[in-house]
């Protein structure tokens, strides 16, 4: 179930949401929603019951679909009841061979298209919704329509939606249904049809089109939904004993404390009808699989909790494609469907194993690889680049799980003879080949996807190698600590989790290596760390809050705003509404901040990266035409789709609902936005031309005085590349090319090669902005009419903002002229100060820098010599502890280099064994520490690196080094005397204990 899974407390032990319902009870997904003044807990079903593959016992033989749609490979499995073959042999009149995943998807979409539904493409995995982390259901792209925030584009629609869910990632591969990536088939009605059609069509689709035996289908309905029960029984003909009435927690969907809500109904497939119906429990996952859910949005929940019928009743449904494929293809789990299994087969061949004969552990690992590769390919295709934050971390984590799992099962090399190469691209090739039907854009982004995966894998392999080194150090430390306190050496759960999460070390490998060294692993502590991360991931990824607030209710009564700003910067309009602090008012007086709604406007509202216009609204007298009010507009935003909200301050007089006003946009600022917006289009084309067509936009800002463009690329741009990009843009600017704008069908625009803007939603008709021969983009922003109006283009900076994402900031138009003039003025001042011509500035600066470097080196050398002279006097102050010479001193304001020289001098001057610990505070708020131990001290087992690092913590810092020499620093100079006293006590104690 889609909306229910997202929005309501309707799924506890029996989730209506396909593919998202197999976690143990402890792993439920909770969404807190306010209902009738109390908090309600939503659980996406996480059944506590154990599951078999399909509920068969002993050694079962099942027919499994593979990369060839009709391959019929025999697979041995083990479960709990009769054979899978017998459990599925009655499915459909057609053989399982004709039911490929693509065929199921096409049949579903064509079925509803024949019944008046518009087939719409899947939306991005990156939702246009700040309340949702990733797209986790098919209804997300229609949420604003269901909540009344946007007008319906079509009366009814059908989709196959790409979805991602990662909060139960540890169960992937271990159950028959858990996946991170899945497809949700859905049909949606926006007031066009309702319960009867939804139910009868769902039944016709499953029994006639897909051929599922009616006697194997069970139905659940909301306990009070007599209408649905009647339709299922009296019109469809389902026996009463196979229709279960369930409560509000299972079968009622609500969007929040108030707003649209309604009952839902689910269709289950029964693998074992011979068990009878007297005590059948739809929550028995070994027997039933819920594959289709229908949500009937028929009520509006009021503030007092009462329900009133909606004027527009909606339908939201969801069918898990992988679940239906599992049923029709007669395989024991979702992974062995032809949607995933070709990736698994490729991974098995690269690991030199056969999936058919592999043990359960190997199969689990191969399933993890197959699932995760689908997820990362689609995420990267949708613009999510591996990083350490947000969605990028999801991709990085999935990639690292594939890499470490692949290495665990023996995959080495790229599959093409290169043992040092990356193997992810070879697996991704298979995933991309399976993507054509659901997302044709994936193929066009092949090069970018493969490159990103290769770079990330090779980087992670280096991280793994660093992890191996860290593990060795942690084991040394555990053994050392145990030796000092007489305990048993143990690797903490926190350290095990660090190795697992940051360095990708499988826990079993950590445990194995630790065992070889005689160190036990704190698995309880590790499990606690994993649970904490799971809770954080769950909270970040799956909480969806929907509510229709007071302001939204007010704005819903306002008509859409007619935008005039493409052709005019001024217009007469009528005030349709006023908001002050979110409350509706009829009149607003001087000095107040206000949000104004007009029936039409020349002001551009912020969207597509372009900021909203600034300007003024004027109110004139009806009789004397004198100016009565002035409102300064400093921002314009969109609300509920196409309602423009003019935000500003009443500078003079008052404004009233229903009155006529004159609107005037600040022409200078608008021209700046136009120049920067067109320059942004040219910049993107230049980037594709210079560094490669696979680069794509990852975000943008078009302001009045600058532009910012984020793009996907794996390295910094060179100075030469930046110069070429800048030169190319300026070449296009000087060509004085006229821009062309036209409105086209979305698909026609894409076919013509138009580039879609990052994160934007598009309707059936789109506006296309073209610089002929240079750029063509889908864009609703404002632009210059001729590239010459841009005047010039200058890149200000280029930098990385995340892993795989770069940012260019630049200026154009008047801002370009101002920038160049300012830089010219700086150069004049510099020439005057250096007393050289502009062309000689670089040479003069290099000379000054070289002189400065020489002077600094001389100063550093003198300081070191002074420190050594001071150290000479310290040698006489050395104390002797059990034949070991010890010096612990504060050397005042000596810098780090001088301190190092002094320590080296002392340890060389004193007879072995000798230990020297020196500290200083150069006066810049910092502390320097150094420890130098002679070979004799090191042989005692006293290491300089560990010793000085511990002392440095007292000074608010840290450090380390080799056993014989180490340096550290800190930021608390006031603690230095106490730290050195502690150092003296500890080195004396350490030497004394070793000598005894």
Swiss-Prot record:
GO terms for cellular component: chloroplast; cytosol; mitochondrion. It catalyses: tRNA(Ala) + L-alanine + ATP = L-alanyl-tRNA(Ala) + AMP + diphosphate. Its EC number is 6.1.1.7. GO terms for molecular function: alanine-tRNA ligase activity; aminoacyl-tRNA deacylase activity; ATP binding; tRNA binding; zinc ion binding. Binds 1 zinc ion per subunit. It comes from the Eukaryota. SUPFAM superfamilies: Class II aaRS and biotin synthetases, Putative anticodon-binding domain of alanyl-tRNA synthetase (AlaRS), ThrRS/AlaRS common domain, Translation proteins. The keyword Protein biosynthesis applies. Signal peptide: none annotated. SMART domains: tRNA_SAD. Keywords: Aminoacyl-tRNA synthetase, ATP-binding, Chloroplast, Ligase, Metal-binding, Mitochondrion, Nucleotide-binding, Plastid, Protein biosynthesis, RNA-binding, Transit peptide, tRNA-binding, Zinc. It is found in: Plastid, Chloroplast; Mitochondrion. Its cofactor is Zn(2+). Zn(2+) binds at residues 677, 681, 779, 783. GO terms for biological process: alanyl-tRNA aminoacylation. Belongs to the class-II aminoacyl-tRNA synthetase family. Monomer. Consists of three domains; the N-terminal catalytic domain, the editing domain and the C-terminal C-Ala domain. The editing domain removes incorrectly charged amino acids, while the C-Ala domain, along with tRNA(Ala), serves as a bridge to cooperatively bring together the editing and aminoacylation centers thus stimulating deacylation of misacylated tRNAs. Catalyzes the attachment of alanine to tRNA(Ala) in a two-step reaction: alanine is first activated by ATP to form Ala-AMP and then transferred to the acceptor end of tRNA(Ala). Also edits incorrectly charged tRNA(Ala) via its editing domain. NCBIfam families: alaS (TIGR00344). This is Alanine--tRNA ligase, chloroplastic/mitochondrial. It comes from Oryza sativa subsp. japonica (Rice).
């Amino acid at each position: 179930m889609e909306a229910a899974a997202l929005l309501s407390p309707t799924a506890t032990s029996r989730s209506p949401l396909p593919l998202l319902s197999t976690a143990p009870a402890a792993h439920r997904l909770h969404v807190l929603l306010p209902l009738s003044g109390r908090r309600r807990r939503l659980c996406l079903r996480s059944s506590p019951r154990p599951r078999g593959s399909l509920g068969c016992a002993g050694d079962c033989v099942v027919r499994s679909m593979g990369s060839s749609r009709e391959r019929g490979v025999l697979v041995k499995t083990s479960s709990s009841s009769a054979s899978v073959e017998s459990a599925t042999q009655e499915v459909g009149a057609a053989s399982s061979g004709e039911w490929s995943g693509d065929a199921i998807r096409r049949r579903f979409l064509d079925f509803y298209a024949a019944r008046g539904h518009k087939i719409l493409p899947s939306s991005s995995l990156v939702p246009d919704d700040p309340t949702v982390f990733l797209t986790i259901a098919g209804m997300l792209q229609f949420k604003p329509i269901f909540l009344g925030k946007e007008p319906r584009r079509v009366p009814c629609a059908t989709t196959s939606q790409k979805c991602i869910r990662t909060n139960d990632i540890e169960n992937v591969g271990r159950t028959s249904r858990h996946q991170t990536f899945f497809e949700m088939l859905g049909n949606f009605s926006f007031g066009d049809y309702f319960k009867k059609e939804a139910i009868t069509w769902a039944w016709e689709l499953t029994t006639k089109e897909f051929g599922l035996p009616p006697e194997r289908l069970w139905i659940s309905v909301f306990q009070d939904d007599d209408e649905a029960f009647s339709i299922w029984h009296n019109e469809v003909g389902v026996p009463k004993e196979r229709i279960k009435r369930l409560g509000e927690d299972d079968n009622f969907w609500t969007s929040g404390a108030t707003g649209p809500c309604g009952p839902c109904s689910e269709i289950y497939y029964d693998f074992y009808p011979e068990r009878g119906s007297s005590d059948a429990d739809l929550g028995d996952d070994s027997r039933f699989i819920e594959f289709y859910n229908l949500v009937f949005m028929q009520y509006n929940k009021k503030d007092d909790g009462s329900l009133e019928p909606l004027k527009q009743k909606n339908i939201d449904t969801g069918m898990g494609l992988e679940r239906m494929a599992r049923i029709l293809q007669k395989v024991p789990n979702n992974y062995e469907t032809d949607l995933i299994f070709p990736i698994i087969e490729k991974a098995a061949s690269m690991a030199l194993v056969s999936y058919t004969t592999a043990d359960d552990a190997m199969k689990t690992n191969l399933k993890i690889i197959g699932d995760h590769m689908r997820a990362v390919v689609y995420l990267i295709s949708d613009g999510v680049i591996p990083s350490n934050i947000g969605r990028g971390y999801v991709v990085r984590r999935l990639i690292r799980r594939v890499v470490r799992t692949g290495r665990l099962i023996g995959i080495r090399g790229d599959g093409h003879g290169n043992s040092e190469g990356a193997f992810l691209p070879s697996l991704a090739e298979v995933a991309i080949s399976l993507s054509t039907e659901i997302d044709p854009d994936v193929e066009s982004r092949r090069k970018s996807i493969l490159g990103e995966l290769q770079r990330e894998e090779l980087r992670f392999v280096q991280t793994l190698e660093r992890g191996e080194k860290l593990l060795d150090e942690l084991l040394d430390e555990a053994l050392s600590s145990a030796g000092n306190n007489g305990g048993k050496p143990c690797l903490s759960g926190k350290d095990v989790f660090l190795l697992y999460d940051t360095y990708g070390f499988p826990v079993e490998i950590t445990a194995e290596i630790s065992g070889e060294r005689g160190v036990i692993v704190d698995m309880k502590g590790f499990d606690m760390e994993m649970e904490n991360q799971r809770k954080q991931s769950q909270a970040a990824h799956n909480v969806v809050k929907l509510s229709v607030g007071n302001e939204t209710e007010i704005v819903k009564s306002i008509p859409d705003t007619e935008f005039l700003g493409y052709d005019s910067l001024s217009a007469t309009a009528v005030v349709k509404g006023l908001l002050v602090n979110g409350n509706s008012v009829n009149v607003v007086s001087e000095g107040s901040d206000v949000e104004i709604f007009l029936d039409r406007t020349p002001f551009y509202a912020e969207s597509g990266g372009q900021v909203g216009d600034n300007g003024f609204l004027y109110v004139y007298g009806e009789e004397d035409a004198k100016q009565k009010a002035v409102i300064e507009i400093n921002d314009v935003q969109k609300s509920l789709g196409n309602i423009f909200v003019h935000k500003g301050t009443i500078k003079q007089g008052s404004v009233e609902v229903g009155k006529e006003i004159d609107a005037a946009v600040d022409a200078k600022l608008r021209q700046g936005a136009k120049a920067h917006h067109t320059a942004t289009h040219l910049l993107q084309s230049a980037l594709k031309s210079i560094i490669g067509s696979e680069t794509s936009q990852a975000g943008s800002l078009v302001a009045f005085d600058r532009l910012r463009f984020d793009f996907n690329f794996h390295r910094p741009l060179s100075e030469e590349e930046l110069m070429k990009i800048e030169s190319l843009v300026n070449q296009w600017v000087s060509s004085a090319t006229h821009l062309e704008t036209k409105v086209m069908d979305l698909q026609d625009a894409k076919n013509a090669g138009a580039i879609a803007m990052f994160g934007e939603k598009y309707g059936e008709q789109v506006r296309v902005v073209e610089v002929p021969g240079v750029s063509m983009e889908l864009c609703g922003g404002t632009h210059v009419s001729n590239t010459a109006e841009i005047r010039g283009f200058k890149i200000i900076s280029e930098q990385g903002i995340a892993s795989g994402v770069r940012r260019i900031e630049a200026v154009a138009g008047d801002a370009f002229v101002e920038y160049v003039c300012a830089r010219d003025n700086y150069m004049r001042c510099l020439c005057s100060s250096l007393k050289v011509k502009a062309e000689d500035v670089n040479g003069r600066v290099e000379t000054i820098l070289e002189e400065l470097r020489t002077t600094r080196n001389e100063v550093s050398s003198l300081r070191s010599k002074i420190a050594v002279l001071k150290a000479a006097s310290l040698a006489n102050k050395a104390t002797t502890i059990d034949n070991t010479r010890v010096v612990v001193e504060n050397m005042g304001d000596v810098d780090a280099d001088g301190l190092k020289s002094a320590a080296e001098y002392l340890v060389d001057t004193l007879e072995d064994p000798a230990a020297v610990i020196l500290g200083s505070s150069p006066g810049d708020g910092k502390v320097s520490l150094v420890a130098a131990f002679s070979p004799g001290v090191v042989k005692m087992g006293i290491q300089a690196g560990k010793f000085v690092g511990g002392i440095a913590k007292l000074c608010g810092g840290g450090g380390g080094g080799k056993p014989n020499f180490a340096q550290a620093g800190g930021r608390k100079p006031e603690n230095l005397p106490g730290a050195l006293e502690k150092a003296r006590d500890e080195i004396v104690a350490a030497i004394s204990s070793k000598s005894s």
